[in-house]
């Protein structure tokens, strides 16, 4: 069954436009509350948010909606998405709710949910909520209305959790870091985590005003961090996005490391301490070089659909621990139940401290394959899936590339486009192959 409101990561949109309006969000919370009460007499829900100005309005709407259904609410204030996931589990709450649109600009916002175990909820739960939304609200009587309170030390509790994921016998003393929180949810906690572990920390992107989240800073705008790291002669820069569930890392030379490289480094660190993973989950976009390197270590790479939700589903299905995306969503399920930019950064820095090597030295054996992406606009009614010329050219190119590259052709989920991606060890070959494939999709002239 198709979901009406939920996307791949909760419900998201422009504030003031359906569905991100206060009246809908109140109805949403009421519907969620009714779903929760089918299995629990008096549920408790935690609500956290990022730093968007609309968070105040949506937080109030959620609180009212839950209370009207007889659900108690605990307000966490500004806190990273993975912090809400952790506290939901630690506080034995029924559900965690995050008000955030992640890496989007401030006019957007969204609502996403975590289970009592701190994991993202499945399609069946979302469909149950959407079904409840179609029903008339049933307000509980006054004696059974929910209550709300604030957990004032939520940031401190999450800081301690993050520190607990770093090896007890190691510190970050002697390391100089620049932390960029994208003027987002981690603006308080991220600098403190690294400082309390011994690092010398300077901060950028840590002065939110409600309107500047992700604006020119953070994981999706790393140029500011590169400039700060090189200017301050820091060892590393750590860039998070607005809700701090993704990571980009910069070294002293200004080199930017993406999620694929950092995932491999986390795997290599486990191997070095005798804890070799059975397998790793990436996505359709994970660079071929990572697959080749992992195979050389006797480790299987399985590709999930793009989206950290699908990486997590594949990890849980196989009972594996490590996975991630090139965008910097990294999962280490023996450390946390969801992607966490701060925890991921600590795993990378732990590998450096334990080995005495830099990130660049630890990744010296990895050279990412050049990747060429061409978007081909489709004409109305064009059937690209049954294009014999495309199928034939794809077979020829895959034979040419062998294990030294790959082809990925997929439709855009939002536009009438086909995305043609080719990876090869040689950039010119990748470009040539991508152009050959794209040409088969061009309309006849």
Curated annotation (Swiss-Prot):
GO CC annotation, single: cytosol
Cofactor note (record): Binds 1 Mg(2+) ion per subunit.
Location of the active site: 102 (phosphoserine intermediate)
Cofactor(s) it depends on: Mg(2+)
Protein origin, superkingdom: Bacteria
Gene Ontology MF annotations: magnesium ion binding; phosphoglucosamine mutase activity; phosphomannomutase activity
Record's keyword annotation contains Heme: no
UniProt enzyme class: isomerase
Enzyme Commission number, as recorded: 5.4.2.10
GO biological process: carbohydrate metabolic process; peptidoglycan biosynthetic process; UDP-N-acetylglucosamine biosynthetic process
InterPro entries: A-D-PHexomutase_a/b/a-I, A-D-PHexomutase_a/b/a-I/II/III, A-D-PHexomutase_a/b/a-II, A-D-PHexomutase_a/b/a-III, A-D-PHexomutase_C, A-D-PHexomutase_C_sf, Alpha-D-phosphohexomutase_SF, GlmM_bact
Residues annotated for Mg(2+) binding in this entry: 102, 241, 243, 245
UniProt feature coiled coil, ranges: none
Pfam families linked: PGM_PMM_I (PF02878), PGM_PMM_II (PF02879), PGM_PMM_III (PF02880), PGM_PMM_IV (PF00408)
Reactions performed catalytically: alpha-D-glucosamine 1-phosphate = D-glucosamine 6-phosphate
Mod. after translation: Activated by phosphorylation.
Modification sites for Phosphoserine: 102
Function field: Catalyzes the conversion of glucosamine-6-phosphate to glucosamine-1-phosphate.
Family that this chain belongs to: Belongs to the phosphohexose mutase family.
Protein name: Phosphoglucosamine mutase
